[in-house]
Amino acid sequence: MAEVRLGENETIESALRRFKKKIQKAGILPEVRRREHYEKPSQRRKRKLEASRRRRR
């Protein structure tokens, strides 16, 4: 879990920027979006196969 502690004389905006950067680096946001709805196992296999094809090109 990404955690950001507010430093002395640090604005909320800068702490929020650091938090967003940590979230993006950890890859949490895409994971949350992917898990938003149930994905059937066949759809998951199809998505992974397409991703591997794109990587091979």
Swiss-Prot record:
Keywords noted in UniProt: Ribonucleoprotein, Ribosomal protein
Residue spans of biased composition, Basic residues class: 43-57
The keyword rRNA processing is annotated on this UniProt entry: no
One Gene Ontology term of the molecular function aspect: structural constituent of ribosome
Organism domain of life: Bacteria
Region annotated Disordered, chain positions: 32-57
Tagged with keyword Ribosomal protein: yes
Pfam family, one: Ribosomal_S21
Single GO BP term: translation
Residue stretches of biased makeup (Basic and acidic residues): 32-42
GO CC annotations, alphabetized: ribonucleoprotein complex; ribosome
Protein family (similarity comment): Belongs to the bacterial ribosomal protein bS21 family.
HAMAP family: Ribosomal_bS21
Protein name as it appears in the record: Small ribosomal subunit protein bS21
Species name: Synechococcus elongatus (strain ATCC 33912 / PCC 7942 / FACHB-805) (Anacystis nidulans R2)
Lineage, uppermost ranks: Bacteria, Bacillati, Cyanobacteriota, Cyanophyceae, Synechococcales
Gene behind the chain: rpsU
